[in-house]
Amino acid sequence: MTEPTQTQPAVAADENQIIAERREKLRALREQGVAYPNDFRPTHHAADLQATFADSDKAALEANPVEVSVAGRMMLKRVMGKASFATVQDGSGQIQFFVTPNDVGAETYDAFKKWDLGDIVAARGVLFRTNKGELSVQCKELRLLSKALRPLPDKFHGLADQEMRYRQRYVDLIVTPETRDTFRARTRTIASIRKFMDNADFMEVETPMLHPIPGGAAAKPFVTHHNALDMQMFLRIAPELYLKRLIVGGFERVFEINRNFRNEGVSPRHNPEFTMMEFYAAYTDYRWLMDFTEQLIRQAAIDALGTATIQYQGRELDLAKPFHRLTITQAIQKYAPQYTDGQLSDDAFLRTELKRFGVDVSQPAFLNAGIGALQLALFEETAESQLWEPTYIIDYPVEVSPLARASDTTPGITERFELFMTGREIANGFSELNDPEDQAARFKKQVEQKDAGDEEAMFFDADYIRALEHGMPPTGGCGIGIDRLVMLLTDSPTIRDVLLFPHLRRED
């Protein structure tokens, strides 16, 4: 059976038959000796060659021959009698191989004609330009390094099934340049953040992933068991309380980029395993944090994309402009101006209005909710999705901010912000609560809520209280969702597009 050509989709053929044919080729290779050799070392990468010799014409390359050793995956092959071409893709890009029996020998040439798309091949040769001007390697030595047993998706149709792209990310990376670009941008973003933090005298640290008590956020944890210690443990939902212990210990500026785990739903914005960057700075407050976070995100965009003006889902977002700042009620009245100050202070009205939006106000989290928590819930229904431009929502109520410092001037309010862009939360920060007695009282309130059925309420962390009792300097802290930030910078509509291996349901 002949393997499908570039115009005959592999999906239309009997894939099992194709695999069987390739296994037979592998069997023949094994009989000849080492089927998967590991003694070839490339000297150049495709993209570097394309960039370095972009201005070298045919005559210049002939006058000054450049010897190269290149390896990669064969993505296209054209056999034309006594001369053949192959497009080879390495980790940086693509380059063309030119293969003739005169250069590589008749035996190698005959073998090459039987190689398949997806095979890992290597060549030593010299650079030249074809008559059409394409930079190519005139192969003097050609080798098969790794036999691919499964066919690649058809060139023109690609990996059309979106779930298959996530499930078989390795294939998606092979055939989809945009996917590779997304994850390179992610790497540049994180590298930029690390550089920015280092320049601001922050120390990168690592804190535990297994916690005896989950804390630092309102979320449902994953539960596991430590056999050696015979104790229940939790995958961390946030590193916050450990990082603030380090502030107590005298490390005045710390940050961590790492995984958090929350045993909650999956959506275009949520994955149970996700990457956060949290940082804490002594002798700062939430206003300093807002200025600092704004500068950090702006610089990350410039380093990742070369500009602070980005396109997201067909709309422009200018990160160079100062970010907006609104209170919760200001945001509600901006995007839902029908609400009066009196209505937004009326418990019964707010509960009725939330019911109209389909919110179950009988659930434990709302049973004893005050005006501030109800206002926040209404904000989430009316304004949050409309916050396209970078906007800090500030001054959150105490009852939904158990770790944030209370305002000195406004009762019931904390020095807290959340940063929204394109209708989604990107960051959350506040002046840290460093009063151990106030913190203990708030933990007790959280325990009461948990006992009442609120699974996301926090536990009482006695050791953290003990740390605060040693004295924590005035501190500001912030968490930035790396995945959501990368979604923004790469114009990705779902979080799965920026996770190499997102969580999926088990295959049937």
UniProtKB/Swiss-Prot annotation:
Binds 3 Mg(2+) ions per subunit. Its EC number is 6.1.1.6. Mg(2+) 1 binds at E418, E425. One of its GO terms (molecular function) is magnesium ion binding. Mg(2+) 2 binds at E425. It is found in: Cytoplasm. It is an enzyme of class 6 (ligase). Its main location: cytoplasm. One of its GO terms (biological process) is lysyl-tRNA aminoacylation. InterPro entries: Aa-tRNA-synt_II, aa-tRNA-synth_II, aa-tRNA-synth_II/BPL/LPL, Lys-tRNA-ligase_II, Lys-tRNA-ligase_II_N, Lys-tRNA-synth_II_C, NA-bd_OB-fold, NA-bd_OB_tRNA. Transmembrane segments: none annotated. Keywords: Aminoacyl-tRNA synthetase, ATP-binding, Cytoplasm, Ligase, Magnesium, Metal-binding, Nucleotide-binding, Protein biosynthesis. Homodimer. Belongs to the class-II aminoacyl-tRNA synthetase family. This is Lysine--tRNA ligase. It comes from Burkholderia ambifaria (strain MC40-6).
